[in-house]
Amino acid sequence: MNDEKDLRFSGTVDHIAVKCDDLEKDVGEYKRLGFTLETLYEDWAMMRDARGFGIALLPPDSKHPTHLGLKVETLAELEAAAARENRPIKPHRDGTSSFYTKGVGGNAVELIYYPDDYGK
């Protein structure tokens, strides 16, 4: 077990973000795999499975990096982690807030907070 002082941040696995060539086509294909469409914008989509696991679909020219998304339960957790990582928090158009940082092997990790009224 890691010492608390060594902990960068923690969260539960929420989603992965992958590149896709054709957003509309890939949304349809993930629906055929049992995913539902949660969010659709011109530049990305979020699909969720029955347990709530998400796949963010990013067109090749997306400003978002491929990444692992970890969810925190409170804004205070997000703020504390962002301070430890020395990263700015960005509020998003869907009401969430997050920051990106480097994870294991240099892969991007997004730490994200969903407010209580998300999706309502």
Question: In which residue ranges do the predicted regions lie?
Answer:
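Short, composition-biased local secondary-structure segments
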Residues: 1-3, 48, 74
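Vicinal oxygen chelate
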Residues: 1-9, 12-21, 60-120
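Core segments of cupin and vicinal oxygen chelate
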Residues: 8-11, 17-54
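A short, compositionally biased micro-patch
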Residues: 23, 40, 50, 75, ...
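Short amphipathic alpha-helices in soluble, non-transmembrane regions
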Residues: 31-32, 81-85
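Conserved short beta-strand elements that form part of the metal-binding/catalytic scaffold
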Residues: 35-66, 108-116
